[in-house]
Every structure is written in structure tokens, then in C-alpha cells.
């Protein structure tokens, strides 16, 4: 059950000039819905992308990395669900290359101008023949169709749009989709996300922007602490807006566009947590007054990853010693527990090394009963801060993953 997350309809999502969408039923795992998505770019565009840090990364990740900087630019993106094409060795790479070749033939570009993406079950060979057979049958689609077609264990399609000023006289549009529900962990996870904007941005600048946005959004979420083999985040700048190219990070428009796309990416990232497998609560962990942002993140992740903390939230049980224990084992060697403060929403829970004198069990129970909760931790060591988003851990998480291949 997703936490305060609903599907967006096609009329709520902005069309982006310079990109065409198509979907088809390839029948890779399921036969009752579209599982193949094609994005065709009209040319003159640039693409930035970041990929999983998992050393056992999937075959399409290897191929997409090698194609990203093709001298003639990316012209097509092909995405299949139902099979990750990971743990498939040399044959997996051959299958990913064949997918690119078939897509190139269908779209009129070079195979090296195609980026392939896969998501689904690991250690099973990809039915590349089904993809090749489905490509000529692709039907025009909208962003809502594409959001549904890239789903795996997701219960709600994830999409969003933004429109805002970049520069003095130009309005920029952006629309994005994402998938992900389990195996979600910082440094990218079992998630795919694609954002398209009509802004014009040079490739090196867009690549840097993509990396920075990923670090500030998708790298701040965790559902279960597992890092996937396939995760990827892509930004497409079609350049169809009439503004001049952003080719320098010193250009004031760089920050304006980054803020616009970052807001969109954060909504998509949070949607993944809201739809975390079996999730019933959306939890924000905010760590303040740390020496560095990395230190703040280290503490936030310790709390957000803890199964004991997450099950306490699921039970609406203010067993808050679990949170303090997680802070304590976060690995901050010189942390002074006697000066930190911890809050549940606005309720002071702990200070001076123990339970706050003003805190009552009834206050904690009232906050824990909510479906959206903020944990705020003040370390009183410096000025840095970081925020991480997570969800609770329920019986359904176990059931969903136990039944995943059945």
C-alpha cells in the first residue's frame, strides 16, 4: 500500500518537444501489460546519465555506459521490464547489443546511439527474441503509459512534471518517470528514472548536473539497504526550447535549471519510498549540526537502515531506544551522546544523554500513529546537515519478496 501516492494521468504530465514515446507488450515475464518502452529523440539533444555502483552491474549498464558518449549523440532509449539481464555473463552483453541493433534498425540510427535498460529478475537469460519481435509493434504512448510500462513490483506508476523560468524570458518544461519499490539503497538502487526537458544544455554540463541531482535526490533514499545491479538515472535535454545553450556551470541558468530538475527528481525519489514494498509509513530522517554532510548522512542512514527502527515504525511503537542505538553505532568515533537532541516531529524525545524530562509515552504514540513522520537529530557538533527518506518494514515486504519469482 503506497503512502499518500496516487497515479498521475496523462493530462497532468507535460509533453516535451523532441521526444517520442512508444510502448509494447513483449511478454518477457507478464503478457497482460506493456513491458517494453521506447524513447526516440529527434536529434540536437544531449543526454546525461549515472549508473549503479554495484560491481555486479547488469549487461545493459555496461552497454549504456559505452554508448552514452557516442560522437553522434544518443537517439533512442529502450527499456524492458521482467528481466534484469544481470548475472548473465557474456551472453547478456550479446543480448543487450542485439537489442540496441534491433532498436537502431527500427528508429534509423546507429546501434551505438541506443541506450538499453532492463529491470526485473536477476540470473535469468533475457528473451531478446521477444524484444526484437515486439519492436515493430510499438504503439505511440504518453508519459503516463511509459510510467506504467517500466513498473515491476511497483503498485503505483511514478511520474511528475515541472515548468519554470530559466533565464529572463524563457519557460522550461520537464517531465520524468521512475520505477522502484524494493532493493532501494543510496548510491542508486533497483530504480530507473528518466527525465526529459526542452532546455538546451551541452553534454559535459548536463552530465555534471545529472550527477549532482542524483546525489541530492536518488542517493538520499533507502527502503531495504540493498543496492541493485541495474539502477540508472538519465536526463535528456532535447534543446527544443528557443533559449541559447547552457554550456558553463557559471551560467546563472545552470542553477535555475538544476533546481527545477532537482525538484522533479526529488518528487520521483520520494515516490519510490512511498511505494516501498509493503510500506505503510513515509519517514524523513533529518540530521543537523554535524561536522560535515557526510557525517550527517552516515548517522541518518544508520537510523533509516535499521530493521528494528523500521519495524517499530510499522508497529506504531515508540520504542525510541532503537533510534538512539542506531545513532550510537553509526560510526562517529567522537560522538558525544550527552549533547545530542532527538525529536519525533516537534516532540523532544531525548537530550542530555537520556529521555527528555518533558517527553511522555502518549506524545510518542501520537506521532508514531501517523503515516508521515520526521525524525530530527541535532548532534551539536557543527553546521552541516543531511536528510534521508525511508519507510517502515512490514509483513508485506517479506511476502512480496518471498513470492517475487512465483
Regions found by a protein language model. Name each.
Residues 100:
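Generic structural marker for isolated residues within well-ordered, non-membrane alpha-helices
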Residues 2-95, 105-406:
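A structural signal for small-residue-enriched, beta-sheet-centric alpha/beta enzyme cores
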Amino acid at each position: 500500500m503506497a503512502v499518500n501516492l496516487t497515479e498521475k494521468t496523462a493530462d497532468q504530465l507535460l509533453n516535451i518537444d523532441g521526444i517520442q514515446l512508444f510502448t509494447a507488450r513483449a511478454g518477457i515475464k507478464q503478457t497482460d501489460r506493456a513491458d517494453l518502452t521506447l524513447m526516440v529523440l529527434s536529434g540536437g539533444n544531449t543526454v546525461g546519465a549515472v549508473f549503479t555502483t554495484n560491481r555486479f552491474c547488469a549487461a545493459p549498464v555496461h552497454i549504456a555506459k559505452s554508448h552514452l558518449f557516442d560522437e553522434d549523440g544518443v537517439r533512442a532509449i529502450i527499456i524492458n521490464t521482467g528481466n534484469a539481464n544481470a548475472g548473465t555473463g557474456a551472453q547478456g552483453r550479446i543480448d543487450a547489443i542485439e537489442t540496441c541493433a534491433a532498436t537502431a534498425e527500427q528508429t534509423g540510427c546507429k546501434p551505438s546511439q541506443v541506450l538499453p535498460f532492463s529491470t526485473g529478475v536477476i540470473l535469468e537469460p533475457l528473451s531478446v527474441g521477444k524484444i526484437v519481435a515486439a519492436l515493430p509493434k510499438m504503439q505511440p504512448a504518453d508519459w503516463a503509459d511509459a510510467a506504467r510500462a517500466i513498473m515491476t513490483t511497483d503498485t503505483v506508476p511514478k511520474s511528475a512534471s515541472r515548468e519554470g523560468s530559466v533565464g529572463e524570458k524563457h519557460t522550461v518544461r520537464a517531465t520524468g518517470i521512475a520505477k522502484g519499490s524494493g532493493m532501494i539503497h543510496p548510491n542508486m538502487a533497483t530504480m530507473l528514472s528518466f527525465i526529459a526537458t526542452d532546455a538546451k544544455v551541452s553534454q559535459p554540463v548536463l552530465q555534471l548536473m545529472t550527477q549532482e541531482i542524483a546525489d541530492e535526490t536518488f542517493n538520499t533514499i533507502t527502503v531495504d539497504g540493498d543496492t541493485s545491479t541495474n539502477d540508472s538515472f538519465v536526463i535528456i535535454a532535447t534543446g527544443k526550447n528557443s533559449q541559447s545553450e547552457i554550456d558553463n556551470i557559471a551560467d546563472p541558468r545552470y542553477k535555475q535549471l538544476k533546481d527545477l530538475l532537482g525538484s522533479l527528481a526529488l518528487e520521483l525519489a520520494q515516490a519510490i519510498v512511498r511505494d516501498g514494498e509493503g510500506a505503510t509509513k513515509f519517514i524523513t530522517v533529518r540530521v543537523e549540526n554535524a561536522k560535515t554532510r557526510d557525517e550527517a548522512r552516515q548517522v541518518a542512514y544508520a537510523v533509516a537502515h535499521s530493521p528494528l527502527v523500521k519495524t517499530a515504525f510499522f508497529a506504531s511503537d515508540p520504542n525510541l531506544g532503537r533510534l538512539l542505538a542506531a545513532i550510537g553505532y553509526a560510526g562517529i568515533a567522537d560522538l558525544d551522546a550527552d549533547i545530542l537532541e532527538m525529536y519525533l516531529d516537534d516532540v523532544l524525545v531525548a537530550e542530555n544523554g537520556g529521555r527528555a524530562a518533558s517527553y511522555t509515552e502518549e506524545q510518542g504514540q501520537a506521532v508514531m500513529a501517523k503515516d508521515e513522520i520526521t525524525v530530527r537529530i541535532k548532534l551539536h557538533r557543527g553546521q552541516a546537515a543531511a536528510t534521508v527518506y525511508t519507510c517502515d518494514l512490514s509483513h508485506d515486504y517479506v511476502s512480496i519478496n518471498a513470492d517475487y519469482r512465483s
